[in-house]
């Protein structure tokens, strides 16, 4: 028995990305907030959903082997079509390694992008908010963030212009040679629109207009960078050189002629021969990938070390689970014995109770603290055999708390019966 392997093997991932299903098809696989909320009720286990413009990934922790199939069944139902066959299923260390690669920016449309770290944080926040992200999913996501930060600190993978939004601006520059003096429109004032506005500002672009459905949000973003702003109105877009679109719209819109439209939506809103989408940015990303290959190799080495660190995280989880479970039993027994002592003494006064409470707590601390210190050292030194022995001996040989109570009650009953027979 290896408790760490047991934890590792309980992780899995359901993965859809621009690489595995394509950008166009990916657009029809996204989950809305209400659908994720419903999924959290449907699934009995820990889970986090990571969704970006180029991936939809569901990370699971469950000792139930059928959990992945349950999720896939739900995905088919909620999309009213079979999408389970498009999924890549990763299990155990393979799922963990994949998340570390994603967090490191080496499995991305734009190698080395920073945005993914925030997106993983958001996935963890949402998971906790929905009550489906407890200690195991949190441990996985937190370690992935540490690996991602270390990769960026110790390699040059994120040096220079990285990220889908930077790629979009670079793509526009490749079409015109320069964007200074060009008339530019940004559709959308959300996270993507905000990133584009910042990048364009840093590039020195000044003739930029923000279009947004919510007028106030568009105005606030425009004021921040000294840009113009209007409510979203497709009829106003004919005089622009470049349009960056970062919106969802239920209908397709014909792109204005003579304008370069870079549509980062999934699915894209605009159509026409002058429209460029995430699919087109992939080609630019491939060139970047070749340039960063040496940094990717260094990142992979850090990821391998991250996997070893995560095994230590799992050992700490074993320790915490053991201490929590064991001490809850000890505390229950302590309380029972205090009550029994008070009955024997025939004194339920506050002072007597306080003395017994303090004495029993002190005894427990003095008896078990050295043992837990040794167990902690065993965890730090990865001494699996010692940990297995301790957890087996000190958790009633693996018998559940309910079963322990049942045995205890039976023994007490037998003891009373035996006493009655002697008296007669």
Swiss-Prot record:
The lineage of its organism: Archaea, Thermoproteota, Thermoprotei, Sulfolobales, Sulfolobaceae. The record marks 98 as: Important for activity. The keyword NADP applies. During catalysis, the active site Cys acts as a nucleophile attacking the alpha-carbonyl group of tRNA-bound glutamate with the formation of a thioester intermediate between enzyme and glutamate, and the concomitant release of tRNA(Glu). The thioester intermediate is finally reduced by direct hydride transfer from NADPH, to form the product GSA. One of its GO terms (biological process) is protoporphyrinogen IX biosynthetic process from glutamate. Pfam families: GlutR_dimer, GlutR_N, Shikimate_DH. Possesses an unusual extended V-shaped dimeric structure with each monomer consisting of three distinct domains arranged along a curved 'spinal' alpha-helix. The N-terminal catalytic domain specifically recognizes the glutamate moiety of the substrate. The second domain is the NADPH-binding domain, and the third C-terminal domain is responsible for dimerization. PANTHER family: GLUTAMYL-TRNA REDUCTASE. The keyword Repeat does not apply. One of its GO terms (molecular function) is glutamyl-tRNA reductase activity. Substrate binds at residues 52-55, 108, 113-115, 119. Pathway: Porphyrin-containing compound metabolism; protoporphyrin-IX biosynthesis; 5-aminolevulinate from L-glutamyl-tRNA(Glu): step 1/2. Belongs to the glutamyl-tRNA reductase family. The active site is at residue 53. Keywords: NADP, Oxidoreductase, Porphyrin biosynthesis. NADP(+) binds at residues 188-193. InterPro entries: 4pyrrol_synth_GluRdtase, 4pyrrol_synth_GluRdtase_dimer, 4pyrrol_synth_GluRdtase_N, GluRdtase_CS, GluRdtase_dimer_dom_sf, GluRdtase_N_sf, NAD(P)-bd_dom_sf, Shikm_DH/Glu-tRNA_Rdtase. The gene is hemA. Catalyzes the NADPH-dependent reduction of glutamyl-tRNA(Glu) to glutamate 1-semialdehyde (GSA). This is Glutamyl-tRNA reductase. Its EC number is 1.2.1.70.
